[in-house]
A protein has these predicted regions:
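Conserved donor-binding/catalytic core segment of Leloir-type glycosyltransferases
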Residues: 4, 186-202, 208-212
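Carbohydrate-associated surface elements
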Residues: 39, 141, 162
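Short His-centered aromatic/hydrophobic patch
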Residues: 86-92, 107
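A short helix/loop element that forms part of the nucleotide-sugar donor recognition site in Leloir-type
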Residues: 169-185
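Nucleotide-activated donor-binding/catalytic signature segment of Leloir-type glycosyltransferases, i.e.
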Residues: 233-258, 266
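Acidic donor-binding loop of glycosyltransferase active sites
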Residues: 262-280, 295
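Short hydrophobic beta-strand element within catalytic cores of glycosyltransferases
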Residues: 287, 291-292, 296-299, 309
Length: 374
């Protein structure tokens, strides 16, 4: 069965969802789907390199209006599609019930959580989801939120974000030492790495406070923070005021990220809920990237983070990620027991390969869409 993917979020546009869709769909048979998406700088060259068919609208954004319904129906007929796949559920998914063909919806997280908690938008979202043939959810968390919005069970396949386990892998001792040297990190540091956008929901301030609490008893502790964002100046000021053992690395290139993960003793992101639960962690691909590098993880209990980190097996999930003392205790639990940390790192790597390899996930996606044989 051939399908047409309709989305605003597709490469060469850069972002987490764009990367996720690319990693999923580029592994499907190229004759099993086509893509309708919005224009973007450099798209012509990118599209020409692909084995599958891509069309782009003149309008900068795909919105749910009658013209879009006609555009989707026309392209679906032209490419011989049997199914439409809409990403995201809102607002683009509103065209679904008016299409000539059955439609599936892709769900990621925030675009389900926020509308699902507000009465009018919950009703609209529920209508789109109930009319869909099938739902592809990027984790159990958005799947549960979808059924809450729909008011009933839905036909859902969970296809979580994945990780390139060839690109992200454990480092040999010599590689680890060289990576630390390249990042300017002492070889004997008890290194806690945190990589993400610097925004309040990610909990960097709690990690900084926890590191400050441990500084006197663990003089070799270092928290290395990589990334940029609107919270950076506040976080720098907090680290300075607490005399916390923190180093801000700025934005690290994608090529260097596996080396930064791999030279850590543990990875931490204390993600947390905000605005009464309207803002939560969708899944947390950074935890999978750390796991693929054989590094244990410390996560805040928010949204899908507890799916990404298997508590007590691949890392630790902190139930109260706003509490620096609870976070400090989790850090010490890993640093005080290197054997346990190594076991968790090895278990994380094995799980990443077994459950979160993009090849495995793309096969699950393709089967759910009828693009592959069962």
């Amino acid at each position: 069965m051939k399908h047409l993917l309709v989305t605003n979020d597709f490469p060469p546009k850069i972002g987490g969802i764009q990367s996720l869709l690319w990693e999923w769909w580029r592994r499907l048979p190229p004759d099993s789907f086509a893509v309708l998406t919005s224009p973007y700088a450099g798209a012509a060259a990118f599209d020409a390199e692909q084995a599958f068919h891509i069309e782009r609208t003149r309008e900068p954004v795909l919105l749910p209006h009658p013209w879009m319904v006609q555009r989707i129906n026309t392209m679906a007929r032209d490419v011989g599609a049997d199914l439409i796949v809409l990403d995201p559920a809102l607002p683009l998914g509103l065209v679904g019930p008016s299409l000539d063909l059955p439609y599936d919806v892709v769900l990621h997280g925030a675009e389900v959580t926020v509308p699902g908690r507000l009465p009018l938008s919950k009703q609209t979202l529920g209508y789109v989801l109930r009319r869909a043939r099938h739902i592809v959810a990027a984790g159990g968390y958005p799947a549960a939120e979808a059924e809450h919005a729909a008011g009933r069970a839905l036909p859902i396949t969970v296809v979580p974000p994945g990780v390139d386990t060839d690109r992200s892998h454990p480092l040999a001792d010599s590689e680890r030492a060289q990576a630390r040297a390249d990042f300017g990190i002492p070889d004997d540091a008890e290194l806690l790495v945190s990589i993400s956008r610097l925004v309040p929901r990610k909990g960097f301030d709690t990690a900084i406070r926890a590191a400050a609490l441990l500084h006197s008893s663990r003089p070799r502790l270092l928290l290395a923070i990589a990334g940029g964002g609107r919270d950076e100046q506040r976080l720098r000021g907090l680290a300075t005021s607490l005399d916390a053992p923190v180093r801000f690395l700025g934005r690290v290139s994608n090529d260097d990220l596996p080396r930064l993960y791999g030279c850590a003793d543990a990875y931490a992101m204390l993600c947390r809920n905000r605005w009464g639960g309207l803002e939560q962690e969708g899944f947390g691909i950074v935890f999978l990237e750390a796991a693929a590098c054989g590094v244990p993880q410390i996560a805040g209990d928010s949204g899908g983070a507890a799916e990404a980190v298997d508590h007590g097996v691949t890392g630790l999930v902190v139930r109260h990620p706003d509490d620096p003392r609870e976070v400090a205790a989790a850090i010490e639990a890993l640093l005080d027991d290197p054997a346990q940390a190594r076991r968790m790192g090895a278990a994380g790597r094995e799980r990443a390969v077994r459950e979160f390899s993009y090849d495995v996930l793309a096969h699950r996606l393709g089967t759910s869409l009828g693009a592959l044989a069962d």
